[in-house]
Amino acid sequence: MKIKFSFKAKKEFINSAKFYEGRVVGLGKRFKQEIRNQLDLIQHNPKSAELKYKDIRVLVIKTFAFTIHYKIEKEYIVIVAIFHSSRNPEKLR
């Protein structure tokens, strides 16, 4: 299955990578690579993450304390949000 990003998720991904890169040179690159690694896992085994909400699965990324929120559609896996665990998940709805 192919992966698609919602506009919001893509923006969160880019902004988070920039934030980490601004903190420590190279950390943004490590963040992006970790997200890509997790997206590969999702792509190869879409049902591996916990079904948390009605149709949204959540994969926890412990290295950076982020979660990837996604849903499985007919032809795509849609990344709905890439969310830092310190944020209120109610804002996703």
Regions found by a protein language model. Give the residues of each.
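Basic, Lys/Arg-enriched alpha-helical interface segments
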Residues: K2-I56, Y76
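Enriched for short, Lys/Arg-rich terminal
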Residues: K29, I61, T67, K71-R93
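Short gly/ser/thr-rich secondary-structure transition/capping motifs
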Residues: L51, I61-K62
